[in-house]
Amino acid sequence: MSLLRKLPNKSFVHQSIVTARFLTTANAFPDEPTSVYYDDLVNAAGSERDLETVRYLLNKRMRDLCFNTANTFKFITNTENSLSILDDLYKTLARLDKGFTRKSAYDTLIARLCKLRKIDEALRAVDIMAEGEFGLNAGSFHPILSALTRGKKMEDAWRLINLMKQVKISPDLTAYNYLLTAYCFSRNLTAASDVLKKMEEEGLGADARTYDALVLGACKAGKVEEAFVLLRMMVDDGQSGLYSTFAHVNGVLLKMGYYAQAVKFVMVCGGRDIKLDTELFGSLASKLIGLGRFDDAKFILNEMNSRGIKMGHKLRDYYEINVKLTVNSQAKETK
């Protein structure tokens, strides 16, 4: 994980050659290009190992406000032949326009390498950013921390936190949230508590992701009351909460057989956000049907219908056949 590597020098083809290549083809730049359009061109050039064209396109797309995406470096794949281009690609990115253009390219490449689980290669990009002063910040480390914690490589994740400090990059709330979530997911509440202490020492607060991790940990440990306390703290702290946070609570209630409480929980949480309602009510209805709790499911579906909450195709079919049709039949029999 050594930092501060020096970049080798290399002669490059003049940009005019690259420009001519594209402007003389049938695929001339449109008046209003998109990020998808540029991604296709970058990947085509990258697949041909034409890094001068890649450099030209990465510069031009930023001038056209077509920002990099998760697909920008899709030509990098998990094969030896593809990865052999990285040394030259690192050097090519170092010659991009200064500022956001260059930083964004490195950050996007780091994210791509992490998706391929090539952590060492991602760290090489970090080295280059640090050495060249290319805008390295906490965000550059996030994909690496995410990959390490998802892979349960917690010692490596902590080493990366220390590495950030060595290069004078303060780990931010998001960085610690990755660690916190991993520990809570694995039910290691002692380690999670240590992370919280570290966050407090460094003057970091809590955001929706922090509470999501803590609620997850409480639910994984079967501590429902503690999860409810955390939800109240989250609301008092001004955080709206993620869908997954409420899903954690619903999941543990159903797992423990507290079906009535799960229905009540969704009813209490509903009415604040239509997207949240769609996910919460729909998910609960589907799970109740799967558990054979048909009366509870019908109640939730009726609530969804009366509140104008959109149902998925399967839920809509179930509602039309098992709820609405039944109600109509009963009404006719009554008459």
Regions found by a protein language model. Give the residues of each.
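Residues in the short coil linking paired helices within alpha-helical repeat scaffolds
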Residues: 50, 82-85, 118, 153, ...
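The canonical alpha-helical register within tetratricopeptide repeats
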Residues: 60, 92-95, 128, 163, ...
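Pentatricopeptide repeat
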Residues: 34, 38, 54, 69-74, ...
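Alpha-helical solenoid repeat scaffolds, predominantly canonical TPR units
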Residues: 57, 88-92, 125, 160, ...
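N-terminal targeting peptides
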Residues: 1-110, 115-124, 128, 132, ...
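Structured C-terminal portions of repeat-based eukaryotic scaffold domains
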Residues: 212-322, 328-335
